């Protein structure tokens, strides 16, 4: 059951919410309001919500940087 984003005409069709990410244990840890997962940290207030999924980042520009937990 992967969390994925599908794009149509450049717009995200589905984005998993922060609450759902935490519920599904996708985030390895939280550091200062950021999700740390597979070397990617994503701000909670990112434009379309959190960008972490089971493979790390869904869209690079949603992530301010990377950090291994």
UniProtKB/Swiss-Prot annotation:
Expressed by the venom duct. Contains 4 disulfide bonds. Its main location: secreted. GO terms for cellular component: extracellular region. The keyword Secreted applies. It is found in: Secreted. GO terms for molecular function: toxin activity. Residues 1-23 form a propeptide. Keywords: Disulfide bond, Neurotoxin, Secreted, Toxin. The cysteine framework is XII (C-C-C-C-CC-C-C). This is Conotoxin Cal12.1p5.
